[in-house]
């Protein structure tokens, strides 16, 4: 294979240069931090409901069937089981159901309930749980709830990692205490630091809340949740009990899946027992979306026109990768994504959509896509807001009709943007969970509109089309899979 187009070589060299410069910067920072005094013991915020910015949600109907009936069932399950997994669609009131369940538990206990809430940082910053609990307390003044703390997975991990603050947290939760885990799928890897830290609190009953508990590696996902439920003490313990260790492949995954994604139960019959165990912790009620006053969603799949220059540039990138000009497969895949998202036809279509809607949400993955979109918006005199990893959600102007750029990883979950009538999935990415979470940012109860439009932009190139199709089928794609796709479809 040869390439007369120098695009791939130029990009590979530019990435290598940037990495060298960043490496030097990191080395200097590391050098200057050598004599930094270690951090003190993490502080647990125990006065979370006194925040003056808390505003009780006024749209929650605590008497509707979805909230009261499901909340009662969840509360009973939480009392009887070490682990309960509540699965409900994004925006359908999972938080309200969970809070109602806590209220029912408190009635059963006959005294103030001890519980903590773990939620993504954007949810904590946005006071989502605070506002829901405050709304419950206003509706039920004789049965008010007061969480011991509301914290993030990262902060909880730091607290548990320190022996003194770990003991303080255990004492704070107390006997018969409960742990509420929002966006439970953040703990789907049983060997991650956050999961291992949470395992140290396995003596407490837990409620995990998510719309997307299982990915295409459902066995590992279920393993993680069952460890939280006390069915297994660790991943190794699960592998020993189930006999699945002999199916481990070179990447550490389990080679027990058929071509259609189903588990090969003939080779690994233990899967039936695992399913029975998972059903014991799972509660996935049917939800009448119409009764929740949620908007209808109209989806638009936008197949973009062919761009011969883009296709040529992608082939040039592939040539550079085969010549090993990229330091890693990650660098190559990012370069491919960046070229696709900088396609002028894609950017022009984006502008046409943005001009038709109020507060359109524009989802992107990599910073290069963000920069390309911002440049195009500025070119057309369109102001914008940005939600990325460093954004304080309180700074977002919810009343503005300007488009909001949202990074999938930073803002796909636990953010409510109820004035928006449009979502544009500008950049296709590799996670089905991120896609589902992104869809729910403006499809929620008590919206300002009865109809929300979702746009999916797909370039006329095999790689982008395959990426869209596989993620929409529910797959979570690793770099190894993406590399195979790039080899086949570019």
Model-derived segments and spans:
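Conserved pre-motif I regulatory segment
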Residues: 40-85
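Walker A/P-loop
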Residues: 82-100
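Conserved SF2 helicase motif VI
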Residues: 431-447
């Amino acid at each position: 294979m040869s390439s007369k187009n120098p695009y791939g070589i130029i990009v590979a060299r530019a990435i290598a240069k940037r990495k060298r410069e960043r490496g030097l910067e990191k080395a200097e920072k590391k050098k200057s931090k050598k004599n930094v005094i270690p951090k003190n013991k993490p502080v647990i915020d125990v006065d979370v409901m006194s925040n003056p910015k808390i505003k009780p949600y006024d749209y929650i109907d605590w008497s509707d069937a979805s909230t009261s009936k499901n909340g009662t069932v969840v509360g009973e399950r939480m009392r009887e089981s070490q682990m309960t997994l509540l699965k409900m669609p994004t925006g359908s009131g999972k938080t309200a159901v969970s809070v109602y369940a806590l209220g029912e538990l408190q009635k059963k206990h006959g005294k103030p309930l001890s519980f903590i809430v773990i939620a993504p940082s954007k949810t904590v910053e946005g006071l989502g749980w605070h506002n829901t609990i405050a709304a419950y307390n206003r509706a039920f003044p004789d049965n008010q709830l007061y969480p011991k703390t509301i914290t993030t997975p990262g902060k909880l991990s730091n607290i548990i990692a320190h022996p003194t603050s770990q003991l303080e947290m255990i004492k704070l939760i107390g006997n018969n205490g409960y742990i509420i885990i929002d966006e439970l799928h953040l703990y789907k890897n049983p060997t991650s630091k956050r999961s291992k830290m949470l395992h140290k609190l396995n003596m407490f009953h837990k409620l995990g809340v998510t719309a997307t508990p299982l990915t295409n590696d459902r066995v590992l996902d279920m393993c993680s949740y069952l460890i939280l439920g006390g069915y297994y003490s660790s991943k190794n313990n699960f592998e020993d009990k189930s006999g699945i260790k002999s199916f481990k492949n070179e990447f550490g995954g389990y080679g027990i899946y058929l071509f259609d994604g189903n588990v090969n139960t003939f080779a690994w019959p233990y899967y039936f027992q695992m399913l029975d165990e998972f059903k014991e912790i799972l509660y996935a009620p049917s939800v009448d979306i119409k009764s929740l006053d949620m908007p209808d969603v109209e989806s638009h799949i936008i197949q973009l026109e062919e761009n011969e220059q883009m296709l040529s540039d992608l082939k040039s990138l592939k040539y550079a990768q085969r010549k090993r000009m990229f330091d890693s497969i990650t660098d190559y895949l990012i370069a491919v994504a960046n070229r696709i998202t900088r396609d002028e036809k894609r950017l022009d279509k984006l502008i046409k959509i943005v001009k038709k809607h109020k507060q359109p949400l524009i989802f992107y993955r990599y910073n290069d896509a963000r920069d390309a979109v911002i440049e195009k918006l500025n070119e057309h005199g369109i102001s914008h807001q940005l939600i990325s990893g460093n954004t304080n959600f309180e700074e977002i102007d919810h009343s503005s009709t300007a488009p909001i750029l949202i990074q999938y990883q930073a803002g796909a979950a636990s953010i409510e943007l109820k004035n928006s009538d449009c979502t544009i999935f500008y950049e296709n990415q590799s996670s089905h969970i991120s896609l589902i979470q992104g869809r729910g940012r403006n499809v929620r109860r008590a919206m300002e509109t009865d109809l929300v439009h979702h746009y999916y932009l797909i370039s006329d190139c095999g790689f982008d089309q395959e990426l869209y199709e596989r993620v929409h089928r529910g797959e979570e794609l690793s770099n190894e899979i993406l590399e195979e796709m790039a080899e086949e479809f570019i």
